[in-house]
Design a protein with these regions (language model features):
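Conserved glycine(s) of the Walker
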Residues: 28
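The conserved Walker
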Residues: 24-25
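Conserved substrate/cofactor phosphate-moiety recognition/catalytic segment
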Residues: 31-77
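Short hydrophobic/aromatic beta-strand immediately N-terminal to the Walker A/P-loop
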Residues: 18-20
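NTP-dependent small-molecule kinase module
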Residues: 148-195
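Phosphate-binding P-loop
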Residues: 7-15, 70-71
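N-terminal pre-Walker A segment at the start of P-loop NTPase domains
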Residues: 1-7
Length: 195
């Protein structure tokens, strides 16, 4: 009679999961995350800076290290990012190759002038500021990376938060859903996600 070992097949194990909250500075990511499901650890450079009283650069480096460690240990985690560079998109691609289930909540506005005004307001109320030129540059770069996010993630929700949060797009595995609003027509959403 064959012996049974303590090994469990991968089919019976739950995949590790990443939840990513992404979008340009001033879009309202942090506001929306208060109401959303997260998986601990929740890795957010702003929170790291606040807790550790360190610089923006040190907080960003520590957040990156924490994400990479979680990935190398096949642990589930949540993180928040502007996602205006390929670095975190590449991290998600690597996670996908390792078998992670990836869920993204992407928050944007219809115009970067809204983001600029929100960041100025946040800074006036004691929050962290971001130079205007960086907001504009990151906004454009972040939106340009949305098709890559849609491709790599299993589930994607895109919310227009120009006034109040309104879901304009959802991807579930291989299904796509569109909800136009006054700022985003269906054709504009399709152009945004490159479908």
């Amino acid at each position: 009679m064959p012996t049974v070992t303590g090994n469990i097949s991968m089919q019976n194990q739950k995949k590790p999961e990443i939840i990513v909250f992404a979008g340009p500075n001033g879009s309202g990511k942090s506001t929306i995350t208060r109401f959303a499901k997260v998986i601990e650890p929740y890795i957010n450079a702003d929170n790291i800076k606040s807790v550790n009283h360190c610089s923006d650069l040190e907080a960003a480096q520590l957040a990156e290290k924490m994400r990479e460690e979680a990935l190398s240990e096949q642990k589930s985690f949540t993180f928040e990012t502007v996602l205006s560079t390929e670095r975190n998109l590449n991290l998600l691609k690597e996670a996908k190759e390792q078998g992670y289930f990836i869920r993204c909540i992407y928050v944007l506005t219809c115009d970067y002038s809204i983001n600029i005004a929100r960041v100025k307001s946040r800074e006036a109320n004691g929050g962290h500021g971001v130079p205007e030129e960086k907001i504009v540059s990151r906004y454009k770069k972040a939106l340009a990376l949305i098709p890559g996010i849609v491709k790599v993630c299993d589930i994607v929700h895109i919310y227009d938060n120009s006034t109040v949060p309104f879901r304009i797009f959802k991807k579930r595995k291989t299904e796509y859903f569109f909800w136009p609003n006054e700022y985003w027509s269906e054709s504009k959403i399709k152009e945004l996600v490159k479908l």
